[in-house]
Amino acid sequence: MSEARISVEDRGFQFADGVYEVIRLYAGRPFALDAHLKRLERSAEGIELELPLTRHQLADEIEKFDVGNAEGMIYLQVTRGVCPRNHLFPELCGQKPVPPTMLFYFRPLPALPAIDSVPAVKLQTAVDERWQRCWIKSIALLPNVLAKNAAVIAGADEAVYIDNGIVTECSASNFFAVINGAIVTHPVGKKVLPGVTRDVMLNLARDLGIQVQERPLTEKEALNADELWIASTTREISWVSHWNGKPIKPGHLGPVGRRLLEALKQHVADQCALNSTPAMASA
């Protein structure tokens, strides 16, 4: 990876004009690969970028990674390509058609912890001043970077966005509350990324007979909830222990979160065939 080269005139480098995905590998196998690639297609469509490969071709490229049975992630990024700097798309400023720049790389990650060892996270609130197209997984992540850094400086692990009193999501994860036995989370859309792990979790919850409410959630409701947790591709589920420096209940992974995490881990094992001979296969 240290030998990779990208032009200084790549639009991703100069304008953050691109989209990306992060795909978790369990024992060398990508989880929910098709869902990630479908989201990449939606993100690319959202910025009027034509992907250089079809979803099936992208899956074939990812499956070529020879990582054995390693735990880790694949980062996939597509930008609008290389051309002289201009805010206009290349085809609108007299340029010849420009091929997109696409890159993949693998990064090893520690194996995710067992259920009894799931870590807690401390959240710090941040005013949600991001744009209105958070459903696009854009490489323009400066607002998220600033929010997360401010949270860590304040002694937290992650920033949680508040939009006029409503909890939307975190700087690098989706946010969930359990209220009277129901899972409550903000609907996807302008302010919330359609997280792949989020979608898997909510479908599993419905299969388990757990009520799911996709609706706006106030900060006051969150602070009075029975359980709070966050979820993402690289972390699965982490329970929330502190909010703006103050401890919150229940002080451990609650019963609904535990039940859902058990189902998620079993689903991952089933989809990634973790008990079979190691070989990369799409999920």
Q: Where are the regions that the model predicts?
A:
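Conserved alpha/beta cores of soluble small-molecule-handling proteins
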Residues: 1-159, 164-166, 189, 193, ...
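Secondary-structure junction motif
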Residues: 197-198
